[in-house]
């Protein structure tokens, strides 16, 4: 690539578009950081706070199903975890989940009300990993 080509490419470079493309390219890894690493493995929200413990009845039910109960994972049937998604906007990304309302309640709304909106998103440690991913992809692009 000539210097002239590089300058022309740099002039047309949209940093927000590049970030969003990188997020989309790494979506499954980012979703795994949120739902698997933070929630399931560690029982923490995006602010690195431990989620409130399960109620005793939930612990008994999880034990009966041979599921993890030492901390809150927000994973019972797997429906909630399987519906995680990322919405990209020009200057932000949003982690969320779409759940199908059952028995008159929306699971995502119910879990957010119980555990807070911060169940979605990345910890500072994982945000740093995201920044590294994005930086590396942008450098490759340029």
Give residue spans per PLM region.
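Short, Lys/Arg-rich flexible segments
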Residues: 1-142
């Amino acid at each position: 690539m000539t210097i002239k080509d590089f300058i022309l490419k740099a002039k047309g470079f949209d940093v927000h578009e590049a970030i969003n493309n990188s997020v989309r390219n790494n979506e499954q890894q980012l979703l795994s950081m949120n739902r698997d690493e933070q929630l399931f493995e560690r029982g923490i929200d995006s602010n690195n706070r431990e989620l409130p413990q399960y109620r005793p009845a939930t612990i008994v039910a999880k034990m009966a199903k041979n599921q993890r109960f030492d901390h809150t994972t927000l994973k019972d049937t797997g429906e909630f975890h399987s519906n995680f998604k990322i919405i990209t906007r020009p200057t932000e990304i949003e982690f969320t989940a779409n759940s199908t309302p059952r028995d008159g309640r929306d699971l995502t709304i119910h879990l957010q009300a119980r555990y807070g909106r911060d169940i979605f998103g990345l910890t500072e440690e994982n945000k740093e990993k995201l920044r590294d991913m994005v930086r590396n992809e942008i450098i490759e692009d340029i």
